[in-house]
Amino acid sequence: MVGRALQHRTVLKDRLASDRPRKLLAIDGGGIRGVLSLMVLAEIERLLIEQSGRPDYRLADYFDYVAGTSTGGIIAAGVATGMSVDQILAFYLQNGAKMFEKQSILRRLKSEYKSEPLAQQLKQVFGEATTLGAPELETLLLLVMRNATTDSPWPISNNPFAKYNDRAHPACNLDLPLWQLVRASTAAPTYFPPEVISCGDKPFIFVDGGVTMYNNPAFQMFLMATVDQYWIGAPPEQRGWTTGTDKMLIVSVGTGTSAGENYSLTPDQMHLLFNASEIPSALMYAALNEQDLLCRVFGECIEGPLLDREIGAMKGSRGPLNQKLFRYARYNAELTKQGLAALGCGDVDPASVQKMDSIAAIDDLQRIGKAVAAQRVRREHFNFEVFRP
């Protein structure tokens, strides 16, 4: 059965009609490093259970909008359908090796891993017939992918008021299979084959959302929650959620980052093959940090690691509007030797946990995630008195 039993389920329509403060959750892409994110989410869930007094309390009971890219899309879809963090973690622990099953030698010219094992597991978890607009989704859900056919980012949500979610539209996005959208968001080029999805009578080729600007989907989620054009089907006075530091909380969870520092690099080493391998990751790293920066510029940062040595963590920063639009917390780990040492994980080899397919490092990734949660996640970040469920 997909989703929670009806008596425990939050009805999305009722949630959208509420005037309570809004809580938004975003999870980065990063392959198997999603396990790190889940340890942070487990601590958040524990604090919410503690405050609510309900052992069966889930992240879907608290968060109104959940966004994810790539592996973050798997986690976000799990949260939106009412899964506990333990249930989502079990998916990774039980299926991690299957998700990264090698292609035959000849097929590795197209992609390193098979798509079928992951697709099959996604069908089992989310249901083959469950669509983006299914009632099993208790929150708004944003999944990020790239439409390779049209050369455009595709941030797609189940917002019933979005332009292409009109049930009268012949290619209504709400009718698309949830498992297939999640699979498309995880179709990392060179790692996995692309996913072909038919929208109405048109087939489109999709790849991982990590190759867009939104591998960290936090600020894009904020825009889709507040900009009126993303709510075009709603009555004018209901197009977008109200902003304010006591009216909106955005929580962003990373999968670990590491700058590709190389102080021994010489100009002669920067040949065609070097640039072909280094530029994509450099662009993704810059885009991920830009999303984080935008959230701190327009939001009141209550938690987050240093962005750089010039602007620091931007806690207490004024910003260009002279007022902040939301409260913001960013939890992430720096997967460098220094960063791991600061988390009490100095014995972990950085190279072993930096790769998105480091199946053998799952235990270390869990340990790192627990260390991040212990150091940085605080009960006051989720104060029920301010951001009531």
Residue ranges of predicted features:
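Active-site periphery "cap/insert" segments of enzyme catalytic domains
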Residues: E116-L140, S152-P155
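Non-catalytic, mobile gating and regulatory segments of ester bond hydrolases
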Residues: M1-R15, P21, Q238-G240, G260
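Patatin-like phospholipase
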Residues: R9, S18-A26, I32-V125, A168
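Short mixed-charge
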Residues: L48-D61, V227-M248, I302, D308-K315
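Active-site gating loop/helix substructures
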Residues: I32, F100-E101, E136-Y230
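C-terminal helical/tail subdomains of lipid-metabolizing enzymes
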Residues: V2, D19, V211-Y214, Q238-T245, ...
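Extended hydrophobic secondary-structure segments that form protein cores and membrane-embedded regions
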Residues: L24-I27, A60-S70, L140-R146, I205-V207, ...
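Extended C-terminal subregions enriched in glycine
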Residues: G233, L249-M270, L294
